[in-house]
Amino acid sequence: MSSNIHANHLSLDASSSSSSSSSSSSSSSSSSSVHEPKMDALIIPVTMEVPCDSRGQRMWWAFLASSMVTFFGGLFIILLWRTLKYLWTVCCHCGGKTKEAQKINNGSSQADGTLKPVDEKEEAVAAEVGWMTSVKDWAGVMISAQTLTGRVLVVLVFALSIGALVIYFIDSSNPIESCQNFYKDFTLQIDMAFNVFFLLYFGLRFIAANDKLWFWLEVNSVVDFFTVPPVFVSVYLNRSWLGLRFLRALRLIQFSEILQFLNILKTSNSIKLVNLLSIFISTWLTAAGFIHLVENSGDPWENFQNNQALTYWECVYLLMVTMSTVGYGDVYAKTTLGRLFMVFFILGGLAMFASYVPEIIELIGNRKKYGGSYSAVSGRKHIVVCGHITLESVSNFLKDFLHKDRDDVNVEIVFLHNISPNLELEALFKRHFTQVEFYQGSVLNPHDLARVKIESADACLILANKYCADPDAEDASNIMRVISIKNYHPKIRIITQMLQYHNKAHLLNIPSWNWKEGDDAICLAELKLGFIAQSCLAQGLSTMLANLFSMRSFIKIEEDTWQKYYLEGVSNEMYTEYLSSAFVGLSFPTVCELCFVKLKLLMIAIEYKSANRESRILINPGNHLKIQEGTLGFFIASDAKEVKRAFFYCKACHDDITDPKRIKKCGCKRLEDEQPSTLSPKKKQRNGGMRNSPNSSPKLMRHDPLLIPGNDQIDNMDSNVKKYDSTGMFHWCAPKEIEKVILTRSEAAMTVLSGHVVVCIFGDVSSALIGLRNLVMPLRASNFHYHELKHIVFVGSIEYLKREWETLHNFPKVSILPGTPLSRADLRAVNINLCDMCVILSANQNNIDDTSLQDKECILASLNIKSMQFDDSIGVLQANSQGFTPPGMDRSSPDNSPVHGMLRQPSITTGVNIPIITELVNDTNVQFLDQDDDDDPDTELYLTQPFACGTAFAVSVLDSLMSATYFNDNILTLIRTLVTGGATPELEALIAEENALRGGYSTPQTLANRDRCRVAQLALLDGPFADLGDGGCYGDLFCKALKTYNMLCFGIYRLRDAHLSTPSQCTKRYVITNPPYEFELVPTDLIFCLMQFDHNAGQSRASLSHSSHSSQSSSKKSSSVHSIPSTANRQNRPKSRESRDKQKYVQEERL
């Protein structure tokens, strides 16, 4: 009862005091000229539940004093301890010197007795130091973010600091100072618990600190000094003072560290952004808290009479408009302390605002536009494309991958590159936004691989920079990408481009690299030189093959020009489809003829499964092979929909249909439950091929009964002579020193060269290696008989060729003429006018920045050769002086009849008629090769006359192989076998091991590998097909060749001006791929066809010694090098009539 009366008395005293103060304020205001209301002094709320000071006296000084005493008292103790420690150290140092002097004076006899107590003392000190160090290390581990306990503790302290700041925000709505009962105030209890934890954590930090003085002065310690002690004072006095609790906002500076501990912030930009934001916000909130304190309290020297009631958030607003120098004036500081603080804060705040805010905006604006993660769409596959991502490479890839001729490409393309796309590339992505997405990142970063969902991707495609200055470095980068991707997800299918053939060996070192599961390396140098080598064997074949594996839209031309027929063939591509059950049991030629005549499809190969279920690709296997159930066929057609006819064909329903467009899925087909019909088009392509056979290799082989050579061939095998490499795929000879194959200009002139291949190469000792082995290997395939091998003469820098020779010294019939392709004397010495092909290559193309000048050497060499003039009597006189006539001149001899089916000109008097193929880097430079064409500089390469005629080749045409390989992994196997002469993964592993071919003895197994299909050019001028050459139908020729000789025709090499009514002297030819049945033939046409291997073709040369694999070689039936000493006494055996008849009219070339 008394306490209640006492409380009421305090309330009355407070009321009277308030009223008197109010009256005095009002009188003062009335006497003032400016009538401005004055804020009342702060009144401490007093209730009977909370005993407070009876006089209503303010106790803010007690709270502040507790903090100041703690801070300065601790600082004094630390300084005192340091001073005493310093004095002790100085004294001990002086005493130590005295004792040391005494020890020296007393001698060593007393050393043992005097040192013993000192050692005991040192041991005691060491034990004490060890105990203190252990406690210090324990405290350091407890607060260190390197351990789990430390991280939990650091995060917990930060979270509790934010909680204490939130409590401050809540209490800021109350008066600055008020009476509160600790046992009833819930927020005060929580704040007390938080500060007890802060006190314990402060103790751990103090123990772990190396420098106690600096620890005492750091920001976090100051925050604890001015926030922890006042809480304990609040409990003792039953009072609450808002005071300096706003300093807890300074803990926000550590926000970025906490996020790094939690592994949330990983990039430098994100860390910097969070740092700037945390510093800016913590400074802003702390300054607002100080303004809130002084404005609501007033100035002490004014007896707190000039205070104003401002909420904390109004102070936050005031500080923001102050930092931004806007200053609306609606809220402003009235106290002297507040205004003084604003004077200094506006200087620092303005500087911080002017520097931090733009940087924050820049970091936010520079946030990766292409960050994020890929979201997989249900029922839709996606592939990841990385590597060399530029406008050119991406546009070429998308143009082929998303071509309309492909059958419903339901695949999303995800590009991953560490550089954001430029405006042009970004526009390209937007045009294909429904199927293309771009993400910025690196495949070397597992986090970025996870962003693009590499583990669920159908494949990963790696593009290479074909124009880089250092091909080996580019290959190394792509190999590292493969390693990173395979390390992240070993099962992912990878298709990568490689520039150099020797770098493919490094891929075999990757444990998870498995070509049997779909991994493929597209070596651009290997395929480029392989295509050029095929042009040496059958000019124009490289253009036809390049067009077959590229997606081209049909361009219709009404006028009767060579472009009309060329473009009709260009629209054909290679597709695969399972054959209908109606073909089961039929021979391959029968099915091939039926498809061509009735379905308007050209089938060139099948996937054959032997008795042990091993799969092999067989090209034109012959009439002995019967079609099996579920056989996969390889077709040449204009689009994928046409190829489905082979799958839908039903003899009962479609036998009498003449229009192939009406061949669709019939009722019989719907009732069948065939395994192939359950496969999607992509599955059909992916499941076919050698990927299912662990022991099979992608070799083009015929049916098992024909794998063993005839008895005559076995009898003629010389087991003591190594004629072929260990796989039996290539001709081989013992390694030769480069000095033995070097010809001087006079030696070359004395050696009558004809029907050979001249390789003009530009390169020096510093040039990147081209990889000439890839050019020579197709020309030395074992499915050529030895006397059919074309001699190869390299004309170029001997320094460069020495670097390449290590990979060439095992091939026969190779010579080198040191010189330059720009020297006409060197070219005449090698009889370039009598060569079958002149190849112009350059190893210096990528070292020039100006793309227009990258091909300058090749273009100059090509124009130099074309401008040369020859006397047709020179070659005849040179040959006749030794008793020989150059092949192709004497047509009365059977051996010198049409060269491989191609009639050599009676004489070549101008370089324009010399067969040339020039390698180009820049496609637009093709306009400089032919001076008589009218090609526009912006014309695509495949539309230009030099490419259509097979006289130019660029590596860019191989870009389409990336998408072709993805949709059908057998395509790359097929094309590599065609253009490389039969290279296999086993051979690549051997070359990777030894970097050279290894010789092997002739056995039935290795000789069986010679039984591979070959390409021939069939002349229509005379012979068994001469009656069809003059106005006959191509379809009749197709059927006759297939039935009579098992030869599969697939294209025409026609004179450019053959359609003109007036005769033309132009000898240029162009390629027509897969003409229709009714296409009219002309006598000068050359027909591309696939023919069987003829074991008897080499019998007439069986007596030739295969050990003479040098430049001094045997003569060929049609083209060879005629070396004077070695050919004088050669006798030719008579050949069988059938063999001679075939070789008279067929130009046999190997793929």
UniProtKB/Swiss-Prot annotation:
Entry keyword set: Calcium, Cell membrane, Ion channel, Ion transport, Lipoprotein, Magnesium, Membrane, Metal-binding, Palmitate, Phosphoprotein, Potassium, Potassium channel, Potassium transport, Transmembrane, Transmembrane helix, Transport, Voltage-gated channel
Stretches for region Segment S7: 529-549
Pfam families to which the protein is assigned, alphabetical: BK_channel_a (PF03493), Ion_trans (PF00520), Slo-like_RCK (PF22614), Slowpoke_C (PF21014)
A GO biological-process term: regulation of membrane potential
Alphabetical list of SUPFAM superfamilies matching this protein: NAD(P)-binding Rossmann-fold domains, Voltage-gated potassium channels
Residues given in the record as Mg(2+) binding sites: E412, Q435, E437
Residue ranges that the UniProt entry lists as topological domain Extracellular: 1-59, 173-187, 234-237, 295-308, 332-340
Residues annotated as transmembrane: 60-80, 152-172, 188-208, 213-233, 238-258, 274-294, 341-361
Motif placement: Calcium bowl: 918-940
Compositional bias (Basic and acidic residues): 1135-1151
Ranges for region Segment S9: 752-772
Subunit comment: Homotetramer; which constitutes the calcium-activated potassium channel. Interacts with beta subunits KCNMB1, KCNMB2, KCNMB3 and KCNMB4. Interacts with gamma subunits LRRC26, LRRC38, LRRC52 and LRRC55. Beta and gamma subunits are accessory, and modulate its activity. Interacts with RAB11B.
Additional note from the record: The protein was initially thought to contain two functionally distinct parts: The core channel (from the N-terminus to the S9 segment) that mediates the channel activity, and the cytoplasmic tail (from the S9 segment to the C-terminus) that mediates the calcium sensing. The situation is however more complex, since the core channel contains binding sites for Ca(2+) and Mg(2+).
Family: Belongs to the potassium channel family. Calcium-activated (TC 1.A.1.3) subfamily. KCa1.1/KCNMA1 sub-subfamily.
Protein name, entry field: Calcium-activated potassium channel subunit alpha-1
Source organism per UniProt: Macaca mulatta (Rhesus macaque)
Gene name of this polypeptide: KCNMA1
